[in-house]
């Protein structure tokens, strides 16, 4: 509905240009907002005030002119001027009802799909030398939610799990794997079941034994030279490490697969060419033996130009080099229209520099959008980055185990007579959903406090509340199994029916914001408001005990669309729904 009003206003502006009211080259930014006070209509715009200077007219006069020139629309019941020149639109109830009716049988819930694009999404991307920890949670689940929403809206999405599968640390790890196998044979495989312990043990050997450190450095050289033995060890290590990652992905309900892995090592063959191409364009400068690029727009507080280091003095490459190679691949091979990077906000400067350099060096097409969608940190209740009681890094699998344990206690307390298998399944969904939703419901760019107590509450904007809200709506149909709705029509008469209908009609607008800005918290807020709107509707408007069949059937259709929207919205967040709790 919002996009429809924007379209009407765009047509009006074009008419003004043709009439000479506005300059022919004038470009207007049209903003349409939902009103908070329904006495002021459903939607409003301040367009008249924005056009005053260009049109040379006062805002109220211009507002009336806009209304007089608006194309006719069955969706608009009336239009009014308010205050200094706001234009308020009142949506026609029957047109809204027809829109909702059509949405019920549509797999996209009545959402008009945008022009499809090819969108590469770089997310999760853990280092394979260690197990996934809580620091990987935000990139993984925020990225996955945006990916799901992009696909639902018809875009071609290419997932890229840019894992850290290369670097000098692998010499140390391979040397330790080699040593363990010499001592214990294939039993050494068991040591890798705990990657953190394996990594610490390898690091200790590296620090304490000069002979071991020499062997580790030798293995790095041999690995980078393509040695078959080293590459075999490296592939085995990566395979075990990736298995750990995908166990976590499966538990989290994340859609990444092995086929989506395109790690740092995938770009090794192109790194030397990146350096040569930058040098050929005269962009490289020598600085203390390293090859760097200075860009005038990036300076420190003292006004000194900040370098992008492309190659170290010892010949080694850096993240920037790999990122440039990846951008070139994503532009020339994957033909991306947009590339989205879900990486910690602390990497903002790095991405600003490499995005700018990729464009400057023509490694990417000018029409390809490069977007760093950064996020804040997940903190403990002391406001500091989330740690174990001993100050260590919290493994993601341990966090999920605790969530499951706490959820099981919660579900059992509310269902003391439920069988253990059902309790366990409900607890699994509630526990994982609580962790994911607590994160996704926060503004992506904000830090947030992790609290099991808050996230497992049945009150407020939480996963348990929304899961219960869905079961409550779906439960209506368990008591209405013999009712035929094939010929039923939605009729909006009661104020709460209209409020619910208006909220349902906003789903498409919300999803557009999710994919345009990479902000799943907007969808979380919408689903919470939708659940509240349904609760108000259900209290004020009897469904199965309605006054007549026409009213009952209409309210059942509204309930059905609410259930469909809640379920789809939660699914786009990567959250399963339950039929009972």
Swiss-Prot record:
One of its GO terms (biological process) is arginyl-tRNA aminoacylation. A motif ('HIGH' region) lies at residues 126-136. GO terms for molecular function: arginine-tRNA ligase activity; ATP binding. Its EC number is 6.1.1.19. GO terms for cellular component: cytoplasm. The keyword Aminoacyl-tRNA synthetase applies. It holds the Pfam family tRNA-synt_1d. SMART domains: Arg_tRNA_synt_N, DALR_1. The keyword Aminoacyl-tRNA synthetase applies. It catalyses: tRNA(Arg) + L-arginine + ATP = L-arginyl-tRNA(Arg) + AMP + diphosphate. It is found in: Cytoplasm. Keywords: Aminoacyl-tRNA synthetase, ATP-binding, Cytoplasm, Ligase, Nucleotide-binding, Protein biosynthesis. Gene3D superfamilies: Arginyl tRNA synthetase N-terminal domain, HUPs, Isoleucyl-tRNA Synthetase, Domain 1. Monomer. PANTHER family: ARGININE--TRNA LIGASE, CYTOPLASMIC, ARGINYL-TRNA SYNTHETASE. Belongs to the class-I aminoacyl-tRNA synthetase family. HAMAP family: Arg_tRNA_synth (MF_00123). This is Arginine--tRNA ligase. It comes from Shewanella sp. (strain MR-7).
């Amino acid at each position: 509905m919002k996009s429809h009003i924007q379209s009407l206003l765009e047509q009006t502006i074009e008419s003004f240009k043709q009439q000479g009211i506005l300059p022919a080259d004038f470009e207007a930014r049209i903003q349409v907002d939902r009103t908070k006070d329904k006495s002021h209509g459903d939607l409003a715009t301040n367009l008249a005030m924005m056009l005053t200077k260009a049109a040379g007219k006062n805002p109220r006069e211009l507002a009336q002119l806009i209304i007089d020139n608006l194309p006719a629309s069955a969706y608009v019941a009336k239009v009014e001027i308010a205050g200094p020149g706001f234009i308020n639109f009142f949506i026609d109830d029957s047109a809204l009802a027809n829109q909702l009716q059509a949405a019920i049988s549509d797999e996209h819930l009545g959402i008009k799909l945008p022009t499809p694009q090819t969108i590469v999404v770089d997310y999760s991307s853990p280092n394979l030398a260690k197990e996934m920890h809580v620091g990987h949670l935000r990139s993984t689940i925020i990225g996955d939610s945006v990916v799901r929403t992009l696909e639902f809206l018809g875009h071609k999405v290419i997932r890229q799990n840019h894992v850290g599968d290369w670097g000098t640390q692998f010499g140390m790890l391979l040397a330790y794997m080699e040593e363990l196998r010499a001592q214990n044979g294939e039993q050494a495989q068991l040591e890798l079941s705990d990657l953190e312990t394996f990594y610490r043990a390898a690091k200790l050997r590296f620090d304490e034994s000069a002979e071991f450190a020499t062997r580790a450095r030798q293995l790095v050289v041999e690995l980078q030279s393509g040695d078959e033995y080293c590459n075999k060890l490296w592939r085995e290590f990566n395979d075990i490490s990736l298995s750990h990652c995908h166990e976590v992905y499966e538990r989290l309900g994340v859609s990444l697969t092995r086929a989506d892995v395109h790690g740092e090592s995938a770009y090794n063959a192109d790194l030397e060419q990146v350096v040569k191409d930058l040098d050929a364009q005269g962009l490289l400068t020598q600085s203390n033996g390293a090859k760097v690029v200075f860009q005038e727009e990036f300076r420190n507080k003292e006004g000194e130009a900040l370098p992008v280091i492309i190659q170290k003095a010892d010949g080694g490459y850096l993240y920037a080099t790999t990122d440039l190679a990846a951008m070139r691949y994503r532009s020339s091979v994957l033909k991306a229209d947009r590339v989205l990077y879900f990486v910690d906000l602390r990497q903002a400067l790095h991405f600003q520099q490499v995005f700018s350099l990729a464009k400057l060096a023509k490694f990417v097409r000018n029409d390809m959008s490069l977007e760093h969608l950064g996020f804040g940190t997940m903190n403990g209740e002391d406001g500091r980055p989330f740690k174990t009681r001993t100050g260590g890094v919290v493994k993601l699998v341990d966090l999920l185990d605790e969530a499951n344990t706490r959820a099981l206690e919660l579900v059992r307390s509310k269902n003391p007579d439920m069988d253990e298998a059902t309790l366990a399944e409900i607890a699994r969904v509630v526990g994982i959903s609580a962790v994911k939703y607590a994160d996704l419901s926060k503004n992506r760019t904000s830090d947030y406090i992790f609290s099991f107590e808050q996230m497992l509450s049945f009150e407020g904007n939480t996963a348990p509340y929304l899961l219960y809200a869905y079961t409550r709506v779906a439960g209506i149909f368990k008591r209405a199994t013999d009712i035929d709705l094939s010929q039923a029509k939605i009729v909006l008469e009661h104020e709460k029916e209209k409020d619910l209908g208006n909220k349902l009609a906003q789903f498409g607008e919300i999803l557009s914001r999710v994919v345009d800005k990479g902000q799943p918290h907007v969808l979380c807020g919408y689903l919470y408001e939708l659940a509240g709107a349904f609760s108000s509707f259900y209290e004020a408007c009897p469904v199965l005990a309605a006054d007549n069949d026409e009213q009952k059937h209409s309210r059942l259709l509204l309930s059905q669309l609410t259930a469909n929207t809640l379920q789809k919205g939660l699914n786009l967040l990567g959250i399963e729904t339950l039929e009972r709790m």
